[in-house]
Structures are given as structure tokens and as C-alpha cells.
A protein has these predicted regions:
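Active-site acidic/histidine proton-transfer and metal-coordination neighborhood
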Residues: 23-26, 58-71, 82-184, 193
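Catalytic domains of carbohydrate-active enzymes, especially glycoside hydrolases
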Residues: 20-41, 107
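C-terminal helical cap(s) of enzyme catalytic domains, especially alpha/beta-barrels
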Residues: 287-304
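Conserved, mostly hydrophobic/aromatic
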Residues: 5, 28, 36, 65, ...
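Glycine-rich, proline-tolerant flexible connector loops at the mouths of alpha/beta enzymes
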Residues: 37-61, 115-121
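Boundary/entry segment of secreted carbohydrate-active catalytic domains
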Residues: 1-17
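Acidic/histidine-rich catalytic cores of soluble enzymes
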Residues: 18, 35-36, 67, 72-75, ...
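Active-site beta-loop-alpha junctions enriched in small/polar residues
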Residues: 8-12, 39-41, 77-80, 116-118, ...
């Protein structure tokens, strides 16, 4: 098992100019991370306007990680394979393929892409709609799976984006692709977005997990936070609403309302031998929150 972090943790520092991606890599190494995960936030591995691969950025990031001795574990990309217009859907698949090219250029063996990131308002996020749109998701995944396979990259799908956050939905999606080599990026916190118990969901999903996203949330009643409700406002430090009408906000690991101790006990007892990647998205300064969260993750792991 390897502990590490997602560069996503330090996105605010990159957006505000306090850190470069190379500083983020140094930070991860200095804080004992065995691996680092990248997301394309403030990191234009693929130009968002032209959709062209930024080969020089990919190469320099890969070389920096090699020079400091830290592994790049995965690359995670939001995507919506359920666009109603066929042409738009085709363009979205081609956009994801460019990110797969970036993953290959970074030297990666695995990559996560979404199928329906934040595109289903709560009133349409139903069981009926899930099964109605399942064939479209599978069609897109199969095309992208062929593309990743040619580059010897393992596809992982995550309980992310609200439409497939529940354990039953994400497992059904993975199983329905027909590919045994499609694995899961298991996010221990994202089950909360659909009001599912994280401990029970983690137990169910662990056999499929290739990589685990470790995070914590504060969980509150909606009535206790008047005026704070906003669908999908998952920015760091923001309250956002769950499917069942509760409110969530990212916290420092171990300081929120998730039972992180029991979650990590379950993971450790399972013999999981993959990657655990911290995702800090609280309102504290990101450098401080990430540092404390990494220390908490190790301290809890050693004690469970």
C-alpha cells in the first residue's frame, strides 16, 4: 500500500500563484508521499481551447517526479458521456482521448475518467434515468477503454459526479462494461453526496478498488445552514447539498463527521495493496490542511 496525495489538494495555491506544479511535487515529496495524483485543474496538460496535448508540460512534470523519486499514480478527469446531442457526445469522447494521451505521455499505468460529472439535476437523478442512460455510458466507456488499452493504461471509474456516486450504481456500471480490467477509484467521502453510509459502501466496493481517494466531510442538517444551499457547489470550503437534503463541507481528515478510523480499519483489514490518495478540500489554507491531513492519515493507519 502506498500513501500519497492528489495535486488537487493544492489547487488554490496554484490558482493564486503561490505554488507551481513543481512546488506541489516538492511539497508531496517533503511530506513523505510515495505517490502523487494529477488532475487538470490549473494544469493544462491538454489545452482547454484547442484540445491539443501540451507535450512539454507532460514531459517536464514526468521528469520532475522522476528526479525527486515520487511515482505518478493516476490522472483523473471530469467528463460527461451523456450529452444528448450525438455530435457533442463525440467531441466529449475525443476530448477525453486527449487526456488519455496526456496520461500516456506522463508514463501512467492507470487513469480515471467520469461518465456524468455534475450534469444530472437532483430531479433527474433517478433509478429509472440511470438504467435508461446506462447503455449510453457503457458505449462511451467501451470506446475509451479500447483507447486506453492500446496505451496499456488501466481504466478506473469513480463514484463521482452525483449520478453514479452510490455503491450499487458504480458497481453496476463497472460490471456492465463487460471488461474485467476496468477497476474503481473508490472515494470514501463521495458516498455521502447520495446519503450512503461510507463504511458500508467502502466494504462493498473494496474488491474493485485500484486506488482510494481519502477525504472527510462535515455533515449538517440543511435547516441549520439557511442560505447556504447550492447544488454541485463543491468548491473548497463551500457547503453543498446532498441528494437527501443534507449539507456537506470538506474538512481536514479526521476532524469531520466521517468515521475515518473505521474506514481505514476496513481498508487495512481487507489487505488492500494499492494507492491511497488524499483529497483535501476544506476551507483552511490548503497547504496547512493537506499537511495535517497527511499526518492524520498515517497516524490513524498505524493505529487501526
Amino acid at each position: 500500500m502506498k500513501f500519497g496525495m492528489s495535486a488537487y489538494c493544492l489547487t488554490p495555491a496554484m490558482e493564486q500563484g503561490r505554488m507551481s506544479v513543481y512546488d506541489v511535487i516538492d511539497f508531496a515529496k517533503a511530506h513523505g508521499c510515495e505517490h502523487i495524483e494529477f488532475v487538470p485543474f490549473s494544469l493544462p496538460f491538454v489545452d482547454p481551447q484547442s484540445s491539443k496535448l501540451n507535450e512539454s508540460l507532460c514531459d517536464s512534470v514526468r521528469e520532475k517526479c522522476e528526479s525527486v523519486g515520487i511515482e505518478i499514480s493516476t490522472y483523473s478527469v471530469n467528463a460527461d458521456l451523456l450529452k444528448p446531442d450525438i455530435a457533442d457526445r463525440g467531441r466529449e469522447i475525443e476530448r477525453v482521448k486527449r487526456h488519455i494521451d496526456a496520461a500516456a505521455r506522463l508514463g501512467l499505468k492507470r487513469m480515471r475518467y467520469d461518465t456524468s460529472s455534475f450534469r444530472r439535476p437532483f430531479e433527474t437523478n433517478t433509478v429509472e434515468n440511470f438504467y435508461r442512460e446506462l447503455p449510453m455510458m457503457i458505449e462511451g466507456i467501451r470506446e475509451l477503454h479500447d483507447y486506453t488499452s492500446e496505451r496499456k493504461i488501466t481504466t478506473t471509474l469513480e463514484n463521482h459526479g452525483f449520478f453514479v456516486n452510490g455503491s450499487d450504481r458504480i458497481l453496476h456500471l463497472i460490471q456492465s462494461t463487460g471488461f474485467d480490467d476496468i477497476k474503481m477509484t473508490l472515494d470514501v467521502g463521495n458516498f455521502q453526496c447520495v446519503d450512503e453510509d461510507s463504511v458500508a459502501a467502502v466494504k462493498k466496493c473494496l474488491p474493485y478498488a485500484e486506488i482510494i481517494h481519502l477525504k472527510d466531510f462535515y455533515v449538517r442538517k440543511k435547516s441549520a445552514l439557511p442560505g447556504q444551499t447550492e447544488m454541485f457547489n463543491c468548491n473548497m470550503g463551500s457547503w453543498f447539498e446532498t441528494m437527501g437534503g443534507r449539507m456537506l463541507r470538506g474538512s481536514i481528515l479526521g476532524q469531520g463527521d466521517l468515521d475515518i478510523w473505521e474506514i481505514l480499519r476496513v481498508v487495512k483489514a481487507s489487505g488492500f495493496d494499492g494507492y491511497i490518495s488524499l483529497e483535501f478540500e476544506g476551507m483552511e489554507p490548503c497547504e496547512q490542511g493537506t499537511e495535517i491531513s497527511l499526518a492524520m492519515a498515517r497516524a490513524i493507519w498505524e493505529r487501526v
